[in-house]
A protein has these predicted regions:
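Short Lys/Arg-rich cationic patches that frequently serve as NLS/NoLS or arginine-rich RNA/DNA-binding motifs
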Residues: 1-12
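Amphipathic alpha-helical scaffolding segments comprising HEAT/armadillo-like alpha-solenoid repeats
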Residues: 2-3, 26-37, 59-71, 95-106, ...
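Alpha-helix N-cap/helix-start positions at coil->helix boundaries
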Residues: 11-15, 43-44, 74-79, 109, ...
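Alpha-solenoid HEAT/ARM repeat scaffold
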Residues: 14-18, 32, 47-51, 82-86, ...
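Structural signature of alpha-helical solenoid repeat scaffolds
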Residues: 54, 89-90, 124
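Extended alpha-helical scaffolding segments
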Residues: 82-107, 114
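Eukaryotic acidic, Ser/Thr-rich intrinsically disordered low-complexity regions
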Residues: 108, 112-135
């Protein structure tokens, strides 16, 4: 039988690991590592990784980054999906137009009203002006 102190120590250890992974996501410049962290079971780690995958921070067109972002449109965590939506509409290259539109249509049916609202605004802008990089 585990004591309460042992359980607390285990929880603190887990929290420290999560904090270390979030810090790694913030500090590493290795996009393969960031992509790997974006697949972590902990939503806070995934969120931190996705923030690092924003085009304004990546500053390059990296296929594996875009592929991972499009995969994450169905993430279970609302905060992660919202950040993915932001990333897709903050500098995605022209050659990804069909994937961007498909992602926005998916987000337009999301269970979260804020994500739906933002996707609706992006789609309206796209239909009106042809531009989706509006965030």
């Amino acid at each position: 039988m585990h004591s309460k102190k042992a359980k607390k120590g285990h929880k603190e250890s887990d929290n420290e690991k999560i904090s270390d992974l979030k810090r790694l996501a913030q500090e590493t410049s290795d996009f393969a590592e960031i992509i790997e962290l974006s697949d972590h079971e902990n939503a806070d780690v995934r969120l931190q990784a996705v923030k690092r995958l924003c085009p304004c921070r990546v500053q390059r067109d990296i296929d594996s980054v875009w592929q991972r972002l499009f995969e994450m449109t169905e993430d279970e965590d609302t905060r992660v999906r919202y950040q993915v939506l932001h990333n897709i509409c903050d500098g995605s290259p022209d050659h990804l137009e069909s994937q961007v539109v498909e992602a926005m249509e998916k987000f337009n049916r999301d269970e979260d009203k804020d994500i739906r609202r933002r996707a609706h605004k992006v789609l309206a802008s796209y239909l009106r002006t042809g531009k989706w990089n509006v965030l």
